[in-house]
Amino acid sequence: MTNLLLYQRIAQQLAEDIRRGVYQPGERVPSVRKMSAQLNVSHATVLQAYANLEDQGLIRARPQSGYYVHQTPALTAPTPDIARVERPGLVTRASIIQQVLTEARRDGVFAFGAAVPHVDYLPVRALHQQLAKVTRFHSPRAFSYMFSPGFEPLRRQIAIRMRDAGVLVNPQEVIVTHGCVDALQMSLRVLTKPGDLIAAESPTYYGLLQLADLLGLKVIEIPSDPSTGISLEALQLAANQWSIKALVLTARLSNPLGGTIPEERQKQLLRLASDYDIQIVEDDIYGELMFEQGKTKALKAFDRLDRVIYCSSFSKTLSPGVRVGWMIAGRYQDEIQRLQTFTTHSACSVTQMAVAAYLENGGYDRHLRFIRQEYRKNLSAYQLAVQQHFPEGTQMTRPTGGFILWVSLPGRVNTQELHVRALEQGISIAPGLIFSNTEQFNHCIRLNCGIPWNKEAERAVITLGLLAQQLCREPAIPLL
């Protein structure tokens, strides 16, 4: 690729951002140095790109100040169609799930159970600095209500970041939420009513099962594979038998399998959803933790018919405590905003402003590179330890990102009993039982590898392995 083509590509991308309103008239675009570092290109290449944009009348240089947006052409935001839908299987695991979450927070417990990143992998100091600045310099606004759809500078930063997932959106299309589960629950509330059927991957995120139970929904579980994602064949069979109102899934780094749907199968999935008029709710909370960024796009990137409601959050990358997520609801935007206005309004004003400031300062990408490297090393270490210390016949997933590991033990091992015995040793795990409304994953566990690999972690894995070996030798224990 020549420099000429490269600078044209950079200019074209920035022009698109300006047309979509990511950068407003009179607003400064990234400096030459910042853009050069961000794209890993020379200063000369960026200067050529900016000169090209000046020729188009899109930006203008100000002496000793930088480049600013000069004019903004009309926004072009196509918003096509969508779907709807219904079927059986009530959710039951709520009390066990609550127990697992409570135990994972106890002092002195090694928390393999909850998928929460260790504090070493959170930019605590940087977030604290931004929170202090927000409360010091913007206190009247920071302590007022922030109504739906949320803090506009934050929505602009999210719109910029969505480009990495292959999704081009206007800031106006972004709705800030109280984390990803809040986005999921609002999606399901506008798509379904009590008694309706939704489809989900199996195994699936236990929070979705809790949410379905809360909303009075029935769940049909569609088998999923760590390498190829949800079974399209099984989904089609289900759609032929029942009226499915919505499909909730994760196309990139599913929880608990850590699987990613290849792009061709993502397109097939969208065609199938169109054929059967199924609305899709995409949970992309782990998407920014893929080890090879840009290799696989979000499902929303291929959504030409506005069939996907996209949901995500900063809980797995910045901090679970900030409770800032977002969604792109397409034709359901007005309905979602009305629902949000009369329930939660929007996420906390202070944290929205602090996260926006943190993203604007440019440290987020550096932070993501750091934690991706750490999680890749952690997963390798935990996988090796499980292989060495768990019973013969144990299998595990090979995630291409994130920090969760799905472990399948020999069939005799009841992991609910393993969970009980592990707690007696000060170790929390997530038994496979909670990831399904069936009992087919009773021999599986999910391990949180977002914990630094050290002697304590090694001892915890060895202890789990010994307990699993012990259960292998005992008569099978029936599930309660």
List PLM regions with ranges:
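N-terminal basic, amphipathic alpha-helical segments
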Residues: 1-134, 337, 341-348, 359, ...
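Short beta-strand "wing" residues that participate in macromolecule-binding interfaces
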Residues: 60-61, 169, 429
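Conserved core segment of the aminotransferase class I/II
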Residues: 127, 304-373
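Conserved core of the PLP fold type I
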Residues: 138-276, 287-303, 309, 375, ...
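Glycine-centered flexible beta-alpha turn that most often forms the glycine-rich phosphate-binding loop
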Residues: 283
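Conserved PLP-dependent catalytic core of the aminotransferase class-I/II
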Residues: 369-394
